[in-house]
From Swiss-Prot:
CDD domains: IHF_A. GO terms for molecular function: DNA binding; structural constituent of chromatin. Belongs to the bacterial histone-like protein family. Disulfide bonds: none annotated. PROSITE patterns: HISTONE_LIKE. Signal peptide: none annotated. Pfam families: Bac_DNA_binding. Coiled coil: none annotated. This protein is one of the two subunits of integration host factor, a specific DNA-binding protein that functions in genetic recombination as well as in transcriptional and translational control. It comes from the Bacteria. InterPro entries: Hist_DNA-bd, Histone-like_DNA-bd_CS, IHF-like_DNA-bd_dom_sf, IHF_alpha. SUPFAM superfamilies: IHF-like DNA-binding proteins (SSF47729). The lineage of its organism: Bacteria, Pseudomonadati, Pseudomonadota, Gammaproteobacteria, Cellvibrionales. It comes from Saccharophagus degradans (strain 2-40 / ATCC 43961 / DSM 17024). This is Integration host factor subunit alpha.
Length: 101
């Protein structure tokens, strides 16, 4: 089973490696993600150099199907957040592909 990196883990890393106190580290992580959320709410692209880009994309309404009944139902139009990894992130992930289980 794979593990997940959480916001609490990020705050702990800031505490251990950069010397922030635990409260400051938690606030920094929360503020970082709040800024990303605010930018996306304001229809702005979020570009994190060396990591990737968060974009908003509008999806049109389309036909769908209820898997239990087979009944056709419309899937409403909506806005979604997409993430496109940057070249550096892609290269690092590809370099480690298949080395961990």
């Amino acid at each position: 089973m794979s593990t997940s990196l959480t916001k609490a883990d990020l705050a702990e890393k800031l505490y251990e490696e950069l010397g922030f106190n635990k409260r400051e580290a938690k606030e920094l992580v929360e503020h970082f993600f709040e800024e990303i959320r605010n930018s996306l709410e304001d229809n702005e692209q979020v570009k994190l150099s060396g990591f990737g880009n968060f974009d908003l994309r509008d999806k049109k309404q389309r036909p769908g199907r209820n898997p239990k009944t087979g009944e056709e139902i419309p899937i409403t139009a909506r806005r979604v957040v997409t993430f496109r990894p940057g070249q550096k992130l892609k290269a690092r992930v590809e370099a480690y592909a298949g080395t961990k289980s």
